[in-house]
């Protein structure tokens, strides 16, 4: 990292080449060229190191302040820090993801705090100790303390639900509920077909759609983990037996019978670093399965399964990268199945763009939306219609302003005009919207509380079925052959 020019120039060119390839530098950036550029002061060793990182590195490569617990004994008039020692390795750099402090209802000095682990104090927060063991999944996000029996505790985490009857000394997993936090889902064309999903902190899973999992015919076809990390977008190429997966912040890979190959678009030294959302949109073209799209703050296209990438847009965000959590990034990406090169993009800062010529020209159509209702809101989904070329559906999310209203719009003319389609929907944030692939009138909608259906192109909505628990539906897909609706719940 701190290597000077002279030291760099005496390194083995093979080692430099290995460094370049192992860190996803562009394939045409060769060791001999880099050596020559450093020699001529056109590049520095530090510049190479800086290029390995991206704008997302600010989330992790920071000096972390430890967790701090404050207490008020006068109804919030004043607060004081309860502990002198630093509470390290609890929330790391993303305490906002947890943020739970719970007090025992029978003892004001017994307190629990959630983080990657789970900690407890019995002296009013002066000292803290671990209240979990290795059987409990990391990332504790919810806690319930039995008001009648304080030692009875239930916690929710990225792996499900765990229960303790002795105040956190020992735990048992409540694994009779098949729970997981799906971000996205995909299907293949095998018989029976498989379902794929990217899950929070549980990688990418693959499992048979058959309800005969445990019969001899399909023995061993239960869910299997095919990739790690926080699983995100999944694309399946049935023809070439390839699966495209990824984990947080746009780390994308191609899976085959060989070793996984990282295919995240690289950036050249001197270019703006690529900003990527936690759940970076990656999409395989419906027109040609060799073609992939990847959306950070720009859209990239690969014509050869992710081996090489070309930017097909400029920055499609407002470019205001606020804080240490990546911002000003694409959140949704959709290609029309009716026309190659007709692509829609939505961003976390409320912009919607469309191109109908493969990225040569982009039109910012969010300016045509009612600005008072939509400006600056997170685009949870923009999706092209499979029936009408110029139609698209748009859903937005306004969590940032403590607002759970459903924001749903439709355009019939490539974004020139938008129609509010929320109509009779309840106050539930919308995560996904898709038209049925066979019936033009049928539209499905996944919200934070379930699944809705319209049979009149969104003029009215009804809850679909009555057996789905009250759970957030983050993705949905209708299998093209079986005509079965598959939901991914979070």
Where are these regions (language model features)?
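Beta-propeller blade termini and top-face loops
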Residues: 1-490
């Amino acid at each position: 990292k701190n290597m000077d020019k002279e030291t760099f120039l005496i390194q083995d060119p093979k080692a430099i080449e290995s460094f370049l390839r192992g860190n996803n530098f562009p394939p045409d950036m060769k060791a001999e060229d880099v050596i020559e550029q450093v020699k001529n002061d056109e590049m520095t060793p530090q510049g190479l190191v800086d290029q390995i990182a991206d704008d997302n590195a600010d989330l992790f490569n920071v000096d972390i302040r430890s967790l701090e617990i404050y207490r008020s004994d006068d109804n919030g008039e004043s607060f004081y820090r309860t502990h002198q020692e630093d509470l390290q390795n609890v929330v790391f750099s993303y305490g906002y993801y947890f943020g739970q402090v719970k007090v025992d209802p029978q003892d004001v000095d017994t307190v629990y705090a959630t983080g990657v682990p789970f900690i407890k104090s019995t002296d009013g927060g002066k000292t803290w100790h671990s209240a979990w063991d290795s059987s409990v999944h990391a990332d504790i996000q919810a806690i319930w303390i039995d008001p009648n029996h304080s030692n009875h505790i239930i916690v929710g985490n990225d792996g499900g639900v765990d229960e303790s009857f002795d105040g956190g000394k020992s735990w048992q997993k409540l694994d009779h509920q098949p729970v997981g936090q799906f971000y996205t889902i995909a299907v293949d064309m095998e018989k029976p077909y498989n379902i794929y999903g990217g899950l929070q902190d549980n990688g990418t899973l693959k499992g048979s759609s058959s309800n005969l999992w445990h019969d001899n015919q399909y023995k061993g076809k239960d869910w299997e983990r095919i990739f790690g990390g926080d699983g995100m977008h999944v694309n399946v190429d049935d023809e070439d037996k390839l699966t495209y997966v990824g984990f947080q912040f746009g780390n994308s890979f191609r899976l085959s019978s060989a070793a996984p190959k990282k295919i995240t678009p690289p950036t050249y030294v001197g270019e703006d670093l690529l900003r990527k959302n936690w759940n970076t949109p990656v999409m395989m073209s419906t027109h040609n399965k060799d073609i992939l799209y990847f959306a950070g703050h720009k859209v990239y296209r690969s014509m050869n399964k992710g081996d090489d990438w070309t930017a097909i847009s400029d920055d499609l965000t407002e470019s205001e990268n606020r804080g240490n959590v990546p911002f000003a990034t694409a959140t949704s990406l959709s290609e029309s199945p009716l026309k190659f090169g007709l692509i829609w993009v939505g961003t976390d800062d409320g912009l919607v763009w469309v191109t109908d010529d493969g990225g040569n020209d982009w039109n910012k159509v969010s300016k045509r939306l009612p600005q008072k209702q939509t400006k600056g809101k997170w685009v949870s989904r923009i999706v092209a219609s499979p029936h009408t070329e110029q139609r698209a559906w748009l859903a937005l999310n306004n969590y940032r302003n403590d607002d759970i209203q459903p924001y749903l719009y439709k355009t019939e003319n490539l974004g020139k005009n938008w129609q509010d389609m929320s109509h009779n929907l309840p106050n539930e944030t919308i995560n996904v919207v898709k038209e049925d692939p066979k019936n033009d009138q049928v539209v499905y909608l996944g919200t934070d509380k379930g699944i809705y259906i319209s049979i009149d192109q969104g003029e009215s909505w009804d809850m679909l079925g009555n057996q789905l628990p009250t759970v957030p539906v983050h993705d949905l897909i209708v299998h093209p052959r079986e005509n079965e609706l598959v939901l991914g719940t979070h």
